[in-house]
Amino acid sequence: MEHKLTFLDGAMGTMLQRHGLKLGEIPELLAITNPDLLTNIHRQYIEAGTEIVYANTFGANRRKMQKTPYTVADVVSAAIAAAKKACIGTSARVALDIGPLGELLEPMGTLPFETAVDMFAEIVDAGVNAGADLICIETMTDLYEAKAALLAAKEHSTLPVWVTMSFDATGRTFTGCTIPSMARTLEGLGADAIGLNCSQGPKQLLPLFQELCRVTTLPVIAKPNAGLPDPVDGHYDLPPEDFARTMVDVVGAGVSIVGGCCGTNPDYIRALHDAVHGMTPGARDIHHGSFLCTPTMPLEISGVRVIGERINPTGKKRFQQALLAGDLDYIVDVAIAQVDAGAQILDVNVGYPGVDEVAMLPRVVRKLQETVDVPLQLDSTNAAALEAALRVYNGKAAVNSVNGEEKALQTLLPVVKKYGAAVVGLALDEKGLPKTAAERVAIARRIVDAAERFGIPREDVFIDCLTLTVSAQQDQAEETLAAVRTVHRDMGLQTVLGVSNISFGLPNRLLMTQTFLVRAMNEGLTLPIINPNQKEIMDAVAAFRVLSGEDEACAAYVERFGSEAALAAEKQRAAAVSSAPTAKAAAAVTNLDDAIIRGLKADAARLAKEALATENELSLVEKHLIPALDKVGTDYERGVAFLPQLLGAAQAAQAVFSVIRDSLAAKGGEPVKKGRIVIATVKGDIHDIGKNIVRTVLENYGYDVLDLGRDVPPETVVDAVVKENIRLVGLSALMTTTLPSMEETVRQLHTLPNPPSIMVGGAVVTPEYAQNMGAFYAKDARASVEIAKKVLG
C-alpha cells in the first residue's frame, strides 16, 4: 500500500449539517431514521474518488446510545448497511468508524481501562457481524484509549485495523502524546496503518506527517481538516483547491492513504483526487531503531541508557514489607529517587513469597505511570503477570526476561508480541550457565531467531550476556565482556547487564562495580542495570558519554559538573539517597510543594498534616498549594509538563484540601473558598472531558464549582446563575454544530440585570469567537484559573 495511493472520504458531520442536522440531534441515529441520506452522502464521496467510506458509526458507543431506544448493534448494523448500499456497483469498501468514548480513562479520568476495551469490543462485534471490510479508529487524543480500541479490534476480529490520532499546534495530542510514542506503540500492538486526522489543516500538520513517515514502517494516513474554522460562522477557511495543493506535499512526504476531516466535502475529495491521482508517495527515510516509551517520553536506545535497579525486593527488607502491605507509595518514592538521579528506564520486579505477582505487577505499573514518565522494564518470568502488566501499560515497555529454553520462548514471546513490547533475552538455557562467550552468543542467536519467527523485530530484542560474581568466577568477567562485544558489534543488538552482580562478596563494591561498568560500556553495553543513586556510578556514565561522542559538546557533562553550586547540590542529593531508601524518612519527597507538583497524594496529605503543626490552614493554601499549582500550570503552558502532570497535581491538591477541611471542621472554622463558578457543556454536546478537567483544577485553587453537566440548555444555566448569584460562568463546546447553543447561552446570560462574566472554551472555540460573543477565551484549564483570579480574586 505504501507504493500506491488509497483515497478515503471527507467529513460526514459537515455533510449532515448541510442537510439540516438539528441542534442536539444524535448523528448516528440517522442510520435508522434516515438511512437514504447517509447512502446519498457516501455515494457522493465515491463519485468524487473515494475508495473507502467511513460508516456513520463514529459515536455509536454504549455511553452515547444509552439514552436512546436503540442498541449499539442496531445503529452499527444500519449504518454499515447504508454505506454498503452506496458501494453497490463500485469497488469501494466500508470501514467501521470508531471514535473516542467521550470520557477520560484512569488514572486521568474515571473510566477503567477494561471497561473501555469492553465498550469498544461491543462496537467491533457489531461491525464484524454487519460486514465491515476494515476498522478505522480515529480522532484519538489519549494513547491509552487508542490502545484499548486497538486491543478490542484485534481480539474481536481479523479485519485490518487503521488508527489515527489528533495532534494540536504543539506537536502533541491533548494528553501530551508524541508522534514517536504513538507510532511505535500502535505499530507494536498490531495496527495495519496509522496516521493523523482532524485538529488542523494539511499545512499545519505537514511537519507532523513528515515526522511520522520517518519513524514508522507502516502505511501513513492523512485526514486533515479543511483548514481552520471561521470564528464567526464556523465555516472552514481553506478552499478545495488549496487543500488539494497542500496535500501534494503530504503525499510527497510519503503518506499513502489520504482523505479529509472536518469541513471537507465531496468537492475537497474530488480536488484531492485530481491533484494527487497517479502520484507515487514520496520515498521515506525511515529510522526504526530500538525504542521504548511512555506517551509523553519517547526513548530511542542509542548510546548508553541507564536502567534503575532498585524496584526489586531482593535483599531489601523495607521493600519486602511494602510489597506485603500493599504500600505502593513507598515504591513510588523509590522510583522517583532513581529518576531524579538519572535513570531513564526503571526495572520493576515484585516477585516475593506471599505476593500475588499477577495482581501486584499491574497495580505497581499503573501506580508508577501516574507519577513517573520514564519507560518501564517489567522484570518477571511469570507469563500471566507479564500479560496483566503489559495490558495496562501505556506505551512501549520492555520485558525482562526470556531465556533460550524452548519452553520459555514458546510461553513468553507470544505475550511480548501481542503487546508490542521489547524483550531482554537472557543468554542461558536448559543446560544452565554457559561458560564461554561463544556459547552465550549462540544462545543469543537462537533467541533472536525465535523472536523473529513470532514477528518480533530484532531491534526489539536486547541481550543480557550475564554478569557473574568475580569473587567466585573470576575468569567469567572477560567472557561476559567478549560476549557483549560480539552481540553489540557483530549482531547489532542492544545489550543488557546487571552490573552490580560483579562485585558481590567483595570489599569496596562500588569501585569494582564502577570499573566493570566502564569496561562493559566500552565493549558495547548500552543498557546497564545499575543503582543510579550511587553518584560515582552515574559520574562514570556521564564521563563515558563524553568520551564515546554521545554527549555532544560535553553539554550534559558540563551541566552536571560545571559549577561549585551544582557540585554541592549533587553531593547533598547523593548523601540523601546514596544507599537505597530503607525507611519512609529517606523518601524522595520531603516538602509539601514538591509532593503536590509530583502528584503524590499520600505524601501531600502527610506533609500537609505535619505542616499544620507550625502553619495555619490559610497559610498552607497561600504559601504552598497555590504556588505549587502555579508551578505546574506554568510548566504546562511551556510544554514541559502535560495533562497527566496537571491532573496529578490537582489530585494531590485535593488531598491537601481534605486535610485542611478536616482541620477547620475540628476547630469549627469556615472552609477555605474563593468564590463560586458555574460550568457546563452546552446543549447538544455530550463531551465533558475538557469541562471536567477545568472543574478539577479550579476546585484545587479553592473555587467552589457548580458543575451542571453536559448537554445543558441555556435556561438551566441562567436559572443556576440567578439562584446562586454567580459571578463567573464557564461554557464548553467541542463540536461546531453546538456553537449556536453556546452563543444562545451567552446571549441569555447577557440579558440578566446583573450579568456574570463568562469564559468559553473547547476544541472549536477560538479567541476571536469568544471576543465576538463578549466572553473570555479559556484555551485550557490553566487559562480558566487566570480568568477566575481576575474575576473573583
Which residues are covered by each model-predicted region?
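Domain-level signal for soluble alpha/beta catalytic cores
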Residues: 1-793
